[in-house]
Amino acid sequence: MDIAVSSWSFHDELYQGKLRLADVPYRVHDLGYGAVELQDMFLWPRPPNLIARLFGKKAPPFNQYQHDRRTLLKVRLNRLRSGTRLVCWTIDSDLTVSEGPDRQKQKAYLAAAIETADFLNAPLIRMTLGGEKNDRSAYGRAVELMSSVLPVAMARKVKFAVENHDGLSSDPAVLAEFVQHFHSPYLGVCMDFGNFEGDRASGMQTLAPHAIHVHAKSREFNAQGEETQIDYRMCVDALKSAGYAGAISIEYEGHDDPAIGIKRTRDLLERYA
């Protein structure tokens, strides 16, 4: 089982400024894991050194849609030095926006994400569809935008993994339909154990055959070590039945010590492997 750790597992420390994205690979390595998933939402530019700050220089403003090259270089170097593999570069996209400046912004964002994934040696990009559930016009716009960016990703040998998340992709049948529309080895599903609104077992059976990346979400555990809201046996069985052989990225969403939450999640995955 190829287990990775998502930077989201350290969300409290990242938001509080106690940890920087570039240092996550070292943190993951120190916890005993060899693979990491990183999110661009934490790609805040590094502050200038002390001397530069004394002369009044400030860090450039954070722009999630325009990746800071200096910060990316630090991420890349730290990942290499830590000896960890980057299994996924994670972005929050919206393929359903209407024509106009916002849609052009999304196209530029996706192009930048592909370039960044290539620069960081990430084999795939986790993305979101956006939109509102059951909005077929939004679905059509998502298909149109994916049609324009998928060839760019293919040229860089970078895959897209669309997560079952809010909006259009919250319906497993719609997400499966979207992926099947393209029949491309460069487009699949990022299946998140926790993001199912209805019957989780049915949703997983729908999405698991299309999964090219997986998020093992967790929040709280009982005395037996089981996740209190998610049946991990069922989730792992669904992956095994589908013949899934890719990475499983731990996303600990709780607020306790991440090291403990991550380990408990790994223990569950290995218990039912």
Name each model-derived stretch:
Residues 1-35, 50-54, 121, 147, ...:
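Histidine-acidic metal/acid-base catalytic patches
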Residues 9, 21-22, 28, 62-73, ...:
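N-terminal-biased segments
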Residues 9, 39-40, 90, 164, ...:
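Residue-level recognition of beta-strand->loop/alpha-helix junctions
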Residues 37, 88-90, 126, 161, ...:
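Conserved beta-strand positions in the central sheet of alpha/beta enzyme cores
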Residues 37-77, 129-134:
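Glycine-rich, proline-tolerant flexible connector loops at the mouths of alpha/beta enzymes
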Residues 40-43, 93, 129, 218, ...:
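Residues that line or immediately flank small-molecule/substrate-binding pockets and catalytic motifs
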Residues 66-188, 198:
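Active-site acidic/histidine proton-transfer and metal-coordination neighborhood
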